[in-house]
């Protein structure tokens, strides 16, 4: 296999996006409009933006390699969306000498990220990719395109399995969410006769506090009635003894941003030591606790897979006797718009425990909650296993990636 020693500028071009005025943005698609892809869109599909197609000449398709230009975190590598793209994204356009998949995996290497992150300038509190430095980065490139494709085929196969697992988990999530809505939003949970309660004429009572009808026997309450709400804190980061490699998982909102697409979380980037727990008066939350980021940003959620703790950017819900993890998860998720609306703060928006205790919810008959929890238990268990398998596949892929790129591992 003949290898060429080149630089990034020899194998691809970087094309910046455009930024039409926000006054032209709309939130629902119309004829003549195209989606404006932003960094956030690769993490959530909840806030799409559309612009007139004629207002830009910068477009990408689902196969294009897109790079997050600003941070933190800087230099995120994306693909999978079609539309126009804004100035916060770069498109890496491969030249004829390199296979697109090979370029994609090359740019995803941690070594490349560390190089870019170290040399990219920080201005106005925001880091931007230094393209001059990136273009000088060396790349070891097999001359034959077929050799390039052979090398990355292993990585593509691992990613295909991860994507398959994600699709299955997404389908399971749709089933569980549909059941929750059917029972607790439409009130068609199984009645005593086994028939859908409201549709079969189950008695509904107007609740003056909630200002709507709820099933007879249900009550009004607030979010703190379905789980014990606890916060977190941060140990002194200047004392290295407060952190350790294998201590208690300590979760930050950034960890949840990296965990988007997953329902459960095991740990973040850092663990705290026993000293850190004590010095910051950190409280451990048990398995099954529902984590909610309460600032920077608000609304990221995950379920604790192990005993853990969090920083001050969280309000976590520890399940109490009558309400399960599954019920809390979907109830809080359904209240996110209200929660965000009540957020306050001059520097950045934040939701306090006091605010959460004012968010009104309907409190079902505990027997209905128990029945729901049993019904979705297998879904949650299957999703958990799929996510754990994906973690293992990701570890294998991330180990193989630099080995394949530097020639320490070859593919026959």
List each language-model region with its residue ranges:
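Non-catalytic DNA-recognition/assembly elements of restriction-modification systems
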Residues: 1-19, 140-152, 156-182, 200-234, ...
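Sequence-specific dsDNA recognition surfaces
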Residues: 5-26, 31-65, 85, 204-210, ...
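A short beta-sheet element
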Residues: 38-39, 50, 55-110, 252-254, ...
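A short glycine-rich beta-alpha junction/loop motif
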Residues: 83-90, 101, 123-152, 294, ...
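Short, positively charged
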Residues: 101-133, 324-362, 412
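Short, solvent-exposed loop/beta-turn-alpha elements that line the ligand-binding surface or hinge
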Residues: 194-199
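Hydrophobic/basic alpha-helical segments
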Residues: 261, 287, 324-325, 329, ...
């Amino acid at each position: 296999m003949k290898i060429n020693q080149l630089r990034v500028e020899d194998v691809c071009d970087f094309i910046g996006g455009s930024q039409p005025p926000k006054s032209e943005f709309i939130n629902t698609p119309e004829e003549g409009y195209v989606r404006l892809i932003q960094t956030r869109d690769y993490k959530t599909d909840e806030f799409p933006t559309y612009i007139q197609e004629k207002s830009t000449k910068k477009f990408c398709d689902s196969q294009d390699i897109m790079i997050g230009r600003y941070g933190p975190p800087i230099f995120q590598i994306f693909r999978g969306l079609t539309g126009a793209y804004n100035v916060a994204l770069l498109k890496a356009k491969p030249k004829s000498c390199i296979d697109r998949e090979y370029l994609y995996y090359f740019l995803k290497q941690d070594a490349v990220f560390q190089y870019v992150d170290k040399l990219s300038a920080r201005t106005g509190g925001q880091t931007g990719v230094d393209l001059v430095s990136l273009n000088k980065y060396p790349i070891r490139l097999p001359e034959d395109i077929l050799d390039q494709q052979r090398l990355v085929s292993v990585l593509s196969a691992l990613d295909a399995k991860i994507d398959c697992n994600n699709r299955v988990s997404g389908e399971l999530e749709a089933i569980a969410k549909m059941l929750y809505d059917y029972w607790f939003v439409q009130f068609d949970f199984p009645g005593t006769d086994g028939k859908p309660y409201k549709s079969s004429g189950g008695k509904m009572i107007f609740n003056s506090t909630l200002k709507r009808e709820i099933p007879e026997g249900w009550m009004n309450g607030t979010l703190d009635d379905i789980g014990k709400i606890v916060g977190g804190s941060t140990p002194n980061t200047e004392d290295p003894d407060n952190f350790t490699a294998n201590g208690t998982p300590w979760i930050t909102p950034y960890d949840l941003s990296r965990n988007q697409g997953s329902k459960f979380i095991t740990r973040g980037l850092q663990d705290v030591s026993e000293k850190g727990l004590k010095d910051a008066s950190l409280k451990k939350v048990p398995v099954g606790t529902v984590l909610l980021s309460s600032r920077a940003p608000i609304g990221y959620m995950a379920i604790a897979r192990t005993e853990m703790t969090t920083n001050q950017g969280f309000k976590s819900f520890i399940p109490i006797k009558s309400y399960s993890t599954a019920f809390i998860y979907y109830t809080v998720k359904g209240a996110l718009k209200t929660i965000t609306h009540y957020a306050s703060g001059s520097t950045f928006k934040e939701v306090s425990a006091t605010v959460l205790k004012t968010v009104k919810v309907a409190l079902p008959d505990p027997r209905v909650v128990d029945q729901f929890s049993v019904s979705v238990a297998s879904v949650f268990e299957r999703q958990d296993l799929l996510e754990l398998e994906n973690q293992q596949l990701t570890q294998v892929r991330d180990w193989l990636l630099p080995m394949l790129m530097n020639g320490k591992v070859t593919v026959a």
